[in-house]
Amino acid sequence: MNYKITSDSTCDLSCEQAERYSIGILPLYVQLGDRTYQDGVDIFPDDIYQHITAGGALATTAAVNLSDYVRAFSALSRKYDFVIHICISQEFSCCYQNACLAAAEYENVYVVDSRNLSTGHGLVVLEAVRCAEEGMEPSRIVEHLQECTAHVDASFILSRLDYMQKGGRCSSVAVLGANLLKLRPAIEVKDGRMGVCKKYRGTFEACVKAYIKDRLQGKTQLDLRRVFITHSGVPDEIIETAKAAVLSYQNFEEICVTRAGCTVSSHCGPGTIGVLFLYER
């Protein structure tokens, strides 16, 4: 069957991955100053960082709107036998709600809530591609993806909290304490929501090593086909440290290093890195 897999830009897959697997990307919106941009189209995380460093206000993000989904689904539904669109968790955005409303007009368009964000979302997108390539019926793919969302392990560790403070997600007292004690919080996604899972103390490099050890050491029943190391802008040596740590605990076939897009980066700021992978069903 002729098919198309699409996703919100929050999947944080690289341009190369999207091109390789013919994944259609629908961008979220980013409000920066008095202008509105499209994530990954005419604005990128470093643009946001430069704006804020220059004294500008924190960027805000908005969902893919209903008309964008209708326009995309209308064109794709005529061209392909079926279309499957995977959204960022509905706990983080109204993308899923908007996509469902748009898809209701087309019998061959299906929408799945990834229950995740960033490459936790991206892992579900790539699983959709795999299923479609194997010739699964669309209804079975949707069912499989809904089961798959519970098997995504998505987490990040932050080196700084100033963006979280500016966004009202932590207090200035908490930021001061974290800076004084060199605390680096790790955040994980559970049931479609984010929460702090552990706080690490020390240099960021040491904390990254400890964080990856906690996520991977001694873990069984992992899907070893692929792991993502996704970051919002960290030094190359931190990425190399993360790659070495991952391989010291698990023998993944592929390590994908990707940059987080504007949605994640505008909330956490630079200096965030995570490992994201699947458990076997």
Regions found by a protein language model. Give the residues of each.
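Short, contiguous strand/loop micro-motifs
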Residues: 1, 59-60, 86, 161, ...
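Mixed-charge interfacial surface used for oligomerization/domain docking
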Residues: 4, 10-24, 28-29, 35, ...
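Class I S-adenosyl-L-methionine
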Residues: 36-105
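Short beta->alpha junction loops
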Residues: 63, 114-115
